[in-house]
Structures are given as C-alpha cells and as structure tokens.
Amino acid sequence: MTRFMNSFAKQTLGYGNMATVEQESSAQAVDSHSNNTPKQAKGVLAEELKDALRFRDERVSIINAEPSSTLFVFWFVVSCYFPVITACLGPVANTISIACVVEKWRSLKNNSVVTNPRSNDTDVLMNQVKTVFDPPGIFAVNIISLVLGFTSNIILMLHFSKKLTYLKSQLINITGWTIAGGMLLVDVIVCSLNDMPSIYSKTIGFWFACISSGLYLVCTIILTIHFIGYKLGKYPPTFNLLPNERSIMAYTVLLSLWLIWGAGMFSGLLHITYGNALYFCTVSLLTVGLGDILPKSVGAKIMVLIFSLSGVVLMGLIVFMTRSIIQKSSGPIFFFHRVEKGRSKSWKHYMDSSKNLSEREAFDLMKCIRQTASRKQHWFSLSVTIAIFMAFWLLGALVFKFAENWSYFNCIYFCFLCLLTIGYGDYAPRTGAGRAFFVIWALGAVPLMGAILSTVGDLLFDISTSLDIKIGESFNNKVKSIVFNGRQRALSFMVNTGEIFEESDTADGDLEENTTSSQSSQISEFNDNNSEENDSGVTSPPASLQESFSSLSKASSPEGILPLEYVSSAEYALQDSGTCNLRNLQELLKAVKKLHRICLADKDYTLSFSDWSYIHKLHLRNITDIEEYTRGPEFWISPDTPLKFPLNEPHFAFMMLFKNIEELVGNLVEDEELYKVISKRKFLGEHRKTL
C-alpha cells in the first residue's frame, strides 16, 4: 500500500512533483504493519485530481492493500459495507425481539383457528387463541436478551455519531450481541425440547425469537470480521463511511421506533396481538397490501393513513441512502480496482517484453482497459443484484412452502407479487411462522426490488446512450451541421470529431512557440538568461523575475542607481517576458473556456488523445524545469497515469490549466512590480547623467 500511496499522491498529467507526499508516510506504513495498528497515510493527492475524482480518496487510502488485488476489494467491502449492514440489522433485531418478549410462545392447537376477516364486520381478525404462559425462566432470559440487544444498538449509534471510540464500541457490541443472541438461542432450543409437548403449537412469538437470535448473531459475526481486519492492519480503527453516510444508523433506528409504535398502536386499535400488529405494519409500510388484516373503525383508518405515509417516506430514504453507499459511492472504487488490475497486467507485460509502445498506442490501450472495466462493472453489478433477488425470491418461497403448506409454485407466485408490491390478497401467510418470516423477508426483499429496477435502468440507459452515439456517427457531418448551427458550432465540432480542441488551436500554439523562440534568441543578445526550447517543442519562458531582480541588484552601483546598459537589457527582457505570459494566458483562457463548457454539458465526456496532448503542451509552457516533467511514451499505462482513476476528465483538465492561469497572473504582477523598480532606477540614472 505504501507504493500505491506514493504514486497516488502524484497523479497528475505526468507532472511528477505537483503533489508531494510527506516523508512520514512510508515510515508510518511500516509501523502500522509492525504494531498492527494502521494509521491513515498522509499522502495527499494534488488538489486538481482530488476535485475531479468520482470518489473520496480517503476511502481508498486507508485500505492497506494493493488496489489491483482481490484482497483490496474484500477489505474495502468489510470496512464500508459491513457497518451499513449492521446498522440495518441491529435495530430490526431489537424491534422483533420486543415481539418475542410480549408474545406468548405456546398455544393450544385446538384453538388455533384463523377466520376469514371478510366474513364478519368486526375488528377482530383472529379468534382469541388460548395461549399458555411461558416458564418464568424463558421470560427472564428474553428480558435480559432484549436489554443487551438494546444496549448494543445504543452503543453502535454512538459510534456512528463519533461519540464513542472504535475499540470501546466494538468490545461492547460484540460482547452484547453475542450474549443476547446466545441466550435467546439457548432459550429457543430448551423451549422446543422440554416445554413444547404435542398439544401445543408454536406461536408467532416463538418464531420471532428464532429470527432475533439469528440477527443478533449475524451482527456479531459481521463486527467480528471488521475487528479482525483492523487487527490485521488492513485499515485504521474506524468505519469507512463518510459523515453523511453515518446518518443511516439514525434513520434505521427511527424506522424501528416507528414500527414499534405502530405495532403497539394497531394492536389496540385492531384487537390483535403485538406480533400480528407488527406483521400488519410491515405489510402497510411496504405497500404490499395483502388484505388479510383490515382496519374497520374510523380511528384505525385515520392512523393507517398517517402511519403509512410517514413510514413509506422513511423507508424510501433508507433505501436511497443504502443504494447510494453501495452503488454510487462505492461503484467508482470498484471501477478503479478493475482498471488498476487491467493496467497492472498490461504494464507488467510491457516491462517484461521488448516491445515499444508509442504514446498514442499506450493511450488507446488505457482507454480500452477503461471501457472493458466499465462494461464488466455494469454486468457484474447486474448479475449480483439479480442473484440476490433470485435468492430472496426462490429461497423465500421455499420457506413459505413449509410454513404455510402451499405448493411451491403458489409460493413463487406469492413471493413475486409481494416483490412487485401488487398484493392481490388471494394468498397471505396465516401461521405464526409464516407471518414472522414475512416481516424480516419483506423488509429486505421489497426494497431490493427498487435497487434492481434502478440498476437495470442505469444499464439500459448506458446501452441506449452507446447506441445513440453509434447511430449519430453514421450520419454525415453535413446533416449534423444543419442540426448544430450558430452558437452550437463548438458542440457540433465535438460531436463530429470527438475532440474539443481544433487543429487551429494547436497550429496557433505552434506558431506562438516559434514566435516566442525567435524573440528569445533576440533577447539573448541582451540577457544571458535566455529561453531554451525543449524536446517537446514547447518554449520555456525567460528566467524567473526573482533572478532578474537579483542580477539587477548586483549590477547596481553603491548608490542603488543602475547603469543605463543594464537598464536597457533588463527592460527588453521584462517586456518579452510579459508578452510571452500574455500570449500563454490567452491560449489558456481559450482552452479553459472550452473545458468549462464541456463540464457543464457532460460530466462523463472523455478527452481524446489530441486533447490531452494539447493540454499537456499548454501546461509545459509555464514550467521552468522541463526535464522534471518529461514523460515517456508509455506514460498512459504507467503507474503515474491519471486515467486509472474514475475521473471527470474535463474538470481535471480545467483545474490543471486554471492553476497555470493563476501562476501566469502572478508572474504578470511580479513583472509590473519589477518594471516599476527598473523605471525608477532608469530615471535616477538619466538624472545623474544630466548632472
């Protein structure tokens, strides 16, 4: 990771030292391995590149693994996704655990008769089942498990809000959820073996206890794996989440409180048990509407409207934030991994072979790697989403088959309708096991359907955009010139050629370089610090103004009055420097204007090879030490290439050239100050001569 950070800190257009890494970075990386307590590396990307990245660089820089390796992806998923999963499961487990405490676990089989809610005109949807009081030990264990689970959730929320340190939080959470899940699991096993004779049936409370125990233990396993990653030195002691992403814990807790309040309220309004009321709240919140439990009274109907409207908004917010973390924030990082993996292989093959690549060939190869990575990313994301969806669909149907004693086809039919939130009502879970499982299954499966539709929509949009481009390229340029005219001339040119800088721009630049070179040769007669033309055909400006001022100070007389021959030489050099800077500034402003227009029109626009070459040439005009910023023909596939990152390319180029503009303006200000000094000394010299 140290080598990655060093290259990560200087990713610009090949201008090696535009971003520096502090000397302590490598030492800290070594210390992190030896002490098993990784510290965040201090390497900092160039500001221009950081602004153009499609992900936050600190999310990658804390992972102590090579970006091209599979372990990088694994530990990134552990550091980022696992806390999000825990934040979603923990509060839900607490919500369900309340039901397993409130509900009795056993009932007499003869009284477990469910009536059709449409056959009468009452609010009672289930005959009062004759439940059996649980042994005192079971109730006591349930209470202790609930308290431990609730405490663990509070601690996790404090850590998400950065009110508690990682080590303290992990110690309490892992211990608390392990004990809570273990006690509940033992309770369930003992009750099944010793306190469940044949005349009793398991109620919804018993099945909620089974689910709560499983969720507690899953949270324990997830946090334990995250803690192991920290102990192995793969990332620092923190959750790899941005500040706005940490708020997801607060929203999931709020949703759990909303479900707890709704279940308690509808239990009284509809005269049903707390567990069945929780099932009703889930059906209403997810807009499935199975119709097996209906509000009859006016008060119940009003509260359903209030509860459902606010609950749907809250659920939609959680789904949006979760998808944003998993796909939008982390998607560019997975793309970076795929590109870096392909680039590393190509770079290794290039270094091992004797084949020479031209700069254009290296650029085309890197573009091909990026396109392949993007295509694989889309299909992999779609495949994983569909696989998870199929698992929820088919495995969920399998559970309902045994819980409700339906045929497997009818279970598939029921699950698919629920995933689409259709809810005809011809099938609905009636048993305690079916309804308990439906609560946890629906809370995970129905929002997943929204993620699938969004993923498929993004993929279809990308495919349609690609087809539009191919169809557009088949048209003749004359047809395009009819569509794009007047003010759209620049955009028309970009659509026709795929380049934002015309040949005239490059020609003007070459002409300017030739003119500057000619003027520099003339000025060399007056000043030893003349400009030199480098191998790339770019003319460097004259010596720095600080050096000119220093030479003028040394040449002056003790009275501080310059001889006229020195004044003439410095004045000519200063005038040429100002002319050179103004012309370069004009070219930079022209390029920046085009790039700014592209940034506003299309953030996904990719620059062509000639565009990058022209931008590189513009940048080098303001570099004094040209040799320090020279690059080989293989630059585009080297570790220093900026194209290995998911970039907003026009914005990156815009920021690079804008920095040059700032430097040029600074040079012009220095020119003006130095010109005043020269004019003053020239006046004093002429005045002395007349005397």
From Swiss-Prot:
This is Outward-rectifier potassium channel TOK1. Keywords: Cell membrane, Ion channel, Ion transport, Membrane, Phosphoprotein, Transmembrane, Transmembrane helix, Transport, Voltage-gated channel. Outwardly rectifying potassium channel. Residues 93-137, 192-203, 267-301, 401-435 are extracellular. The gene is TOK1. Belongs to the two pore domain potassium channel (TC 1.A.1.8) family. It is a multi-pass membrane protein. One of its GO terms (biological process) is intracellular potassium ion homeostasis. PANTHER family: OUTWARD-RECTIFIER POTASSIUM CHANNEL TOK1, POTASSIUM CHANNEL, SUBFAMILY K. It comes from Saccharomyces cerevisiae (strain ATCC 204508 / S288c) (Baker's yeast). The keyword Iron does not apply. It is found in: Cell membrane. One of its GO terms (molecular function) is voltage-gated potassium channel activity. Residues 504-550 are annotated as: Disordered. The modification Phosphoserine is found at residue 119. Residues 504-513 have a biased composition (Acidic residues).
